[in-house]
């Protein structure tokens, strides 16, 4: 019986999709369904993939709707208990799917499990060993640029990087799917935050490893596209998931965090993009879907708040 569906979003990924699929099939000994959701690519990535991997279910969208719409289509199409999201610019290591599947099955409260991501240019360096968010309004990857020999213990994380993580499908029906107003960036923090509010947990599994190119769709680590959506979505994420009392409590930290980021992006030549994106973030809050505050979940909010403060120290250490 198949328990897991792998969903791979694709947009003009001719350089990456074939190696991604090849590594997935060569490194896995578990029965799985694979869905590639294409965001209206203009290259030959899907044509090439269909020729070499006809067993894959290809869903072709008419244009680029963004990461969130693509993975939502894939998740809804899946008929398995678990869904594994995988970026097209990744190459999984041996046993990747099995190790994530084994971990998430251990506890029904586990919503997601993130893999250990290694840098494509140097497999000896970590790309991400857990996804975190803090009271400064900063999302960050734990262990970035550290040796692959570090961060070898399984642990809880704030959220799971959706580029290489397995999810319990039934929970999406309870907390909602990826918010398509995000288009791309911070959507994984948002859904991980929501899961935490509802009392679920997110884990990091170091035994499951994947090589990640990073920024394959946007072109570089810091660019106008990535800055625009990540900054805009951060405002929306805060508004959506934090009740008023939590926003007020974190406001001094958030103001400091936004100011530091403004200086950072100004030095990168993206200062005006950053400021405009802040305004855009406030604009989409009105049309957004704020999580309804439920006092019965106060303990969950307090746990989240404690972690937001702890993660400031984690980020600055």
Where are these regions (language model features)?
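Short, acidic, metal-binding catalytic loop of nucleotide-sugar glycosyltransferases
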Residues: 22-31
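Short aromatic/hydrophobic "clamp" motif used to bind/position activated sugar donors
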Residues: 83
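Glycine-rich, basic loop-to-helix element that forms the pyrophosphate-binding segment
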Residues: 61-78, 88, 99
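A conserved acidic beta->alpha catalytic loop
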Residues: 23, 38-47, 63
